[in-house]
């Protein structure tokens, strides 16, 4: 399977900082445009996610970057051969853990209290495609 990807991230006309970040094949993208083509072999791994920092709170850009970097480390460290059920369980555990890390960051840095992010994307693992 060949994946043709393009990432475009821009601060826009309203805000002064970009709270969004994309993770594409191990690279982080904010305030940039790039293209990427990946040829997935049966056991290839690939990840493409977008984390959108929550507007209305300080630190959305911090939360989105924390989530993207954390997912990259999580995904890179996954062992081979996990069953679908085990993989899904590990992803759910990761979601709980990164949520706690982001909340703890806000608790430790009061100026960022309430920070948060959304995260959506897909990843390829062991010949299957998953949505997150």
Model-derived segments and their meaning:
Residues 1-132:
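PP2C/PPM-type serine/threonine phosphatase catalytic domain
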């Amino acid at each position: 399977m060949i994946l043709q990807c393009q990432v475009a991230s821009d601060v826009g006309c309203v805000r002064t900082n970009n709270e969004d970040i994309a993770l594409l094949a191990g690279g982080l993208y904010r305030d940039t445009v790039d293209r990427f083509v990946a040829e997935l072999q049966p056991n290839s791994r690939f990840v493409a996610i977008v984390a959108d920092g929550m507007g209305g709170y300080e630190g959305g850009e911090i939360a989105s970057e924390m989530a993207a970097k954390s997912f990259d480390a999580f995904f890179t460290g996954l062992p081979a051969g996990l069953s679908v059920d085990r993989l899904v369980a590990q992803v759910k555990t990761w979601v709980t853990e990164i949520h706690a890390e982001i909340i703890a960051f806000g608790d430790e840095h009061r100026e960022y209290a309430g920070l948060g992010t959304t995260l959506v994307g897909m990843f390829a693992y062991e010949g299957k495609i998953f949505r997150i």
